[in-house]
Amino acid sequence: YKLQQPGARQFMLIFASVGALAGVVNTVLSANGNILTFLFGVIDVTIASVVAFDSSIQPGGDPVWGNFALHAFYFLPMQFVGWWQWRKRGADSKAKVRARRLTRGSAALTVGVFLSGTAVAYYVLCWFGSDISDGFHAIILFDALVFVLNVLGQILMSLAYMEQWYVWILVNVFSVFLWSGKAMASADSSYTVVMVIKYSFYLLNSINGLRIWWKLSQKGHRESDLEEKVS
């Protein structure tokens, strides 16, 4: 049945809740360096894609097409890339991944990509939302920020860099604002509230993830130094 029909609203609430639960498991496993995070990630991003699509076609408010494209066409395939990369760095269902850190040059490049990417994404999303009048749109800016940060965060995560957690903290802060705005703008905001709760938990978990991965990256750095000395 069509998602716009009244009877579909309850289904979408349950559907979003299942995705939120999978996302919680996904982020907890990720924070602990467990490769099974990508299994639950597939479930999470698939459901999040449907939720973002449905939210974007709701009457009234600003669409979140960037969020939809991010999940459907980037996050989903990157789950498989991440699984492959983590396996290369020693992760399995029992062993944690060997984490690493960015060099100063790589960190500067990441910041530059973020700033330029956000500007480009904002104007592309404004153009794509043909029903939106000219002018500044805070929701679209948040959508662009979340889009670019998620792209960077997923790359850093797949390559097992500790700095991913700085990115995820920003992602979750902006996501809370994004979905809070959707909840206030939409006539039926039941499942958007679920998304606000979901990203609020993600924010707390990302802070814990930074703590854990800081230690994992120190251990990974020591192991790399030892391997170089042995070789």
Label each region the model flagged.
Residues K2-G19, N67-L76, S133-V146:
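Structural signature of hydrophobic alpha-helical transmembrane segments
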Residues L21-T27, V45-V50, F73-G82, F147-L152, ...:
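Alpha-helical transmembrane segments and their membrane-interface exit regions
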Residues Y1-K2, T46-S55, G117-C126:
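Membrane-embedded alpha-helical segments in integral membrane proteins
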Residues I43-A99:
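Hydrophobic, ordered structural segments
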Residues L70-W86, R98-C126, F142-G153:
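Alpha-helical transmembrane segments of multi-pass integral membrane proteins
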Residues N26-F40, I155-V167:
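Membrane-helix interface "capping/anchor" motifs
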Residues I155-S231:
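C-terminal transmembrane-bundle signature of multipass membrane proteins
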Residues V50-G66, W127-D134, A183-V193:
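Helix-coil boundary and interhelical linker segments in multi-pass alpha-helical membrane proteins
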